Amino acid sequence: MSDSAGLIAHNWGFAIFLLGVVGLCAFMLGLSSLLGSKAWGRAKNEPFESGMLPVGSARLRLSAKFYLVAMLFVIFDIEALFLFAWSVSVRESGWTGFVEALVFIAILLAGLVYLWRVGALDWAPEGRRKRQAKLKQ
């Protein structure tokens, strides 16, 4: 038996499954376009708000601080993922893996200290921070 015939014989179940999924999706899309309503109007292009016409704009202006917090969350979440993977294989990696994990943590801590020193993690406006510092003295 040739390689291509063996590959086809081995994966025929997956091919039938894939054809079934594509066929079911095409059937559901076709049925919804046939049976769905065809009415067009101004309200069709508006977002649904409990049957009420929308008032104002849906765009919200967010402070850049929220994006900074989201980026820090992603960075430290990935750090936790890498450290979890390291902790699973700590016996196999030995002291070399331990030193590599320490270097990884040190680099991330250096970045965190830099952000802290620059003031990227300060949420209060500078004037309010100065007033609070004067009150504490």
Curated annotation (Swiss-Prot):
Subcellular localization is given as: Cell inner membrane
Transmembrane intervals: 12-32, 66-86, 95-115
Short name of one Pfam family: Oxidored_q4
Coiled-coil annotated spans: none
Q: How does it sit in the membrane?
A: Multi-pass membrane protein
* Alphabetized InterPro entries for the sequence: NAD(P)H_OxRDtase_bac/plastid (IPR023043), NADH_UbQ/plastoQ_OxRdtase_su3 (IPR000440), NDAH_ubi_oxred_su3_sf (IPR038430)
Q: Which Gene3D superfamilies match?
A: NADH:ubiquinone/plastoquinone oxidoreductase, chain 3
Q: What PANTHER family is this protein classified in?
A: NADH-QUINONE OXIDOREDUCTASE SUBUNIT A, NADH-UBIQUINONE OXIDOREDUCTASE CHAIN 3
Q: What is this protein called?
A: NADH-quinone oxidoreductase subunit A
The scientific name of the source species is: Pseudomonas putida (strain ATCC 47054 / DSM 6125 / CFBP 8728 / NCIMB 11950 / KT2440)
